[in-house]
């Protein structure tokens, strides 16, 4: 609604489905708006530095990326209906999502763990560390070609998104990326070393002092960032009318990587993905999972 009303937008990640992300790109471009995908990672020095080192060959030929996401939530959520707090427009909060009874475990931060509104921890945290992974792999406007995953969802409470997971992606350039739960971290492994960190925003680590102290020289790849943060970058672009450092198409691509994992877990088999056409190859059921979901009442997208 905001984009169609002529507003520039900074929007928290992720989109709800793959096709919703495609519609978002079309809407931003149709109305010529500035759109910033909101994850702060591209302004965090350790992730910017990590991606630049990988892109400039400091670890040799990139072979594997290992991503670990935190274990969230820590409980299944209480579905017991509660009175809607005074002054809270719960119907507006639900928007196009299905009607459901109010409970505090459904709203605010906790919406992330309910599949009517989000894709769980893989989407919530994956949009952070998968973006760094795709940035370093030079696939930020593309994606993997194959996904294989196992996992299970929360049961017995309010939450229904993925709880346990083991995901492997394969890219056309031969790089593989794995994703498992644990202490949030990312590691790029190449033919001549590795670089990464253990812990959110934790200090950079590498297989050698030479990699850690390496300088990016003239003529090498420089990745655009803004140390003053995503909000400053967005405001600068509102004035300049240029794309911000995390524009709508790149935001959509990293959300897609997250959705691919959830779909592969639900399908229970290896999936082939065409990142150019943005469709699964030979799997109609998986493609159906990419759809824009029907809206509630007068709410609709498209």
Predicted regions and their residues:
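Basic phosphate/pyrophosphate-binding loop/patch that engages nucleotide-derived ligands
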Residues: 26-33, 49-64, 73, 81-85
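NAD(P)-dinucleotide binding in Rossmann-like oxidoreductases
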Residues: 157, 165-228
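Rossmann-like dinucleotide-binding domain that binds NAD(P)(H)
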Residues: 91-173
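Beta-strand-loop-alpha-helix segment that lines the small-molecule cofactor/substrate pocket
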Residues: 1-43, 57
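Active-site rim elements
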Residues: 37-39, 115-123, 151-156, 217-224, ...
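Core domains of carbohydrate- and sulfate-ester-processing enzymes
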Residues: 66-106, 290-292
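C-terminal helix-rich "cap/oligomerization" subdomain common to oxidoreductases
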Residues: 34, 160, 236-302
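Non-transmembrane alpha-helical segments in soluble domains
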Residues: 25, 51-54, 94, 130, ...
